[in-house]
Regions:
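Bacterial N-terminal signal peptides
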Residues: 10-21
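Acidic glycine-/aspartate-rich tracts in secreted/extracellular proteins
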Residues: 37, 55, 62-63, 80-82, ...
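Functionally critical loop-and-helix segments that line ligand-binding/catalytic clefts
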Residues: 232, 305, 330, 335, ...
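Extracellular beta-strand-rich solenoid/capping regions of secreted or surface-exposed proteins
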Residues: 45, 49-52, 64-77, 85-130, ...
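Right-handed parallel beta-helix/beta-solenoid
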Residues: 19-46, 50, 61, 79, ...
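Extracellular beta-strand-rich, repetitive "passenger/adhesive" scaffolds
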Residues: 59, 79-83, 113, 136
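Extracellular beta-strand/beta-solenoid scaffold signature
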Residues: 88-101, 117-126, 147-176, 189-203, ...
Length: 441
């Protein structure tokens, strides 16, 4: 009896293996080269159109002037970021992963390309899950913008992008994206570097790791921003879908937002309806020389304006090196250059559950600035960066100073603690700082 069962199990496993092999065998490899020679396609889009689900498309070195739209699971593999070039001059995007018009789009890989000169985003990942964007150079996109102030934000941009004024989508935009991995890319010369937003659907569980995001002058290096749902109109914007549970890790983010004012890493809600940017992690990044603080969390609406509060809860800022960034402005202003700014503006949306820990902050006038009617926890940080280690800046924004900053167990630059000779200071009310660390953590 046991032998018979074993034989049957072996046969079932073998049959399953054959089935799996048969399924894998249907995936084909297609090729593209500029000449269309050797049975290859001359255009990337032609190969994409011909591909079946799970096919691999190898793109040879050369320049391809096109706007590639992908609506099926496949792998698009270039010869290297400086070899296979998608030049999207006067075209909307270099690459669009279009899950809005292809519901259920998943498991698309893009690697080994330069994507440049698009009117809007170089790469747009739209309503897609499980995409991998790795080892690309995304440069000099957003050529139609940036546009600020009144009037059309980004002329001709699709209706599903509800609030891209200033960056026209950025170099790489994850819009309604889930479980995306963005790794090892270089983004420079765009309006901003990487944008995650929720205009068309919730954006969650995405990982940005090991990217170099530099010299994107008009907006942030990396920004997680909650925008109104498409179809929602003022004055009664619908609740936003949310930008949640994303991880921004081990990126080099420098010299962004220097012409207009952009953070190294931004956690924002745009002030048009109740937004949600919550439970995200900013960890082990280098955030230096950006136009406004290295990490900036902004909310602009709330009870003080008779409006529902934004949900900016549960964000964590951990183990980053932050140095030489600029001051914040407008309704989230800080008195000078700032490392981290947690700011509800005048709207009074409480920012609950913020954790700031293990960061090293240098060359700032204010290391950590806070304005929110909730408790913010900042522990185990090296606050030797500036004259003020922790500041409660609520009075600067005419907000109610009802929040608490728990800044115990930080190193303030010397063993004798804050507000002593040679140590960083505190500024403002409701700051706890005892006990402190006598040496860096």
């Amino acid at each position: 009896m046991h032998r018979s069962i074993s034989c049957r199990l072996v046969m079932i496993c073998f049959a399953g293996s054959l089935t799996a092999f048969s399924t894998a065998a249907v995936a084909n490899t297609l090729c593209v080269n500029p000449a269309g020679s050797h049975s290859c396609y001359a255009k990337i889009q032609l190969a994409v159109n011909a591909a079946a689900a799970n096919d691999v498309i190898n793109v040879a070195a050369g320049t391809y002037t096109e706007d590639v739209v992908i609506g099926k699971s496949l792998s698009l593999i270039g010869a290297g970021a400086h070899q296979s070039v998608i030049n999207a001059a006067n075209l909307a995007n270099g690459i669009l992963l279009d899950g809005l018009n292809n519901p259920g789009l998943h498991n698309v890989t893009i690697t080994g390309f330069t994507v440049e000169n698009a009117l809007y985003e170089g790469v747009l990942v739209l309503n897609t899950s499980g995409a991998t964007i790795t080892a690309n150079s995304i440069v000099n996109n957003d050529t139609i913008g940036p546009v600020f102030g009144s009037g059309p934000a980004c002329n001709g941009q699709p209706a599903y992008e509800t609030d891209e004024s200033g960056d026209c989508g950025g170099g790489l935009h994850l819009l309604g994206a889930v479980h995306t991995t963005v790794s090892g890319n270089v983004l420079t010369g765009n309006a901003d570097g990487i944008l995650i937003s929720d205009d068309s659907a919730e954006s969650r569980d995405n990982l940005l790791i090991g990217n170099v995001v530099t010299d994107n002058p008009a907006e942030c290096g990396i920004v997680l921003a909650s925008h109104p749902p498409m179809g929602s109109v003022p004055p009664n914007f619908a609740p936003h879908y949310g930008v949640d549970h994303n991880t921004v890790a081990e990126n080099i983010v420098s010299k962004n937002g220097v012409t207009v004012g952009g953070a190294g890493a931004g956690l924002f809600s745009d002030g048009e309806g109740p937004g949600r940017t919550s439970d995200n992690i900013i960890i082990r990044n280098q955030l230096t020389g950006n136009g406004i603080p290295g990490v900036a969390l902004h909310t602009h609406v709330g009870p003080a304006f008779g409006a529902p509060a934004d949900n900016m809860s549960g964000n964590q800022i951990i183990g980053n090196f932050i140095a030489g960034n600029g001051p914040d402005t407008d309704d989230t202003a800080t008195p000078g250059p700032t490392g981290i700014n947690i700011n509800s503006g005048g709207g009074g949306s409480p920012v609950f559950g913020t954790v700031i820990t293990g960061n090293v902050i240098r060359d700032e006038q204010i290391d950590i600035a806070v304005n929110t009617p909730a408790e913010v926890d900042a522990h185990l940080n090296d606050l030797y960066g500036g004259a003020i280690g922790v500041a409660n800046v609520c009075a600067l924004d005419s907000a109610a100073c009802t929040g608490l900053i728990n800044a115990t167990e930080n190193f303030w630059g010397c063993s004798t603690g804050p507000n002593t000779k040679g140590c960083a200071k505190t500024s403002g009310s409701a700051i706890l700082f005892t006990p402190w660390l006598v040496k860096p953590n």
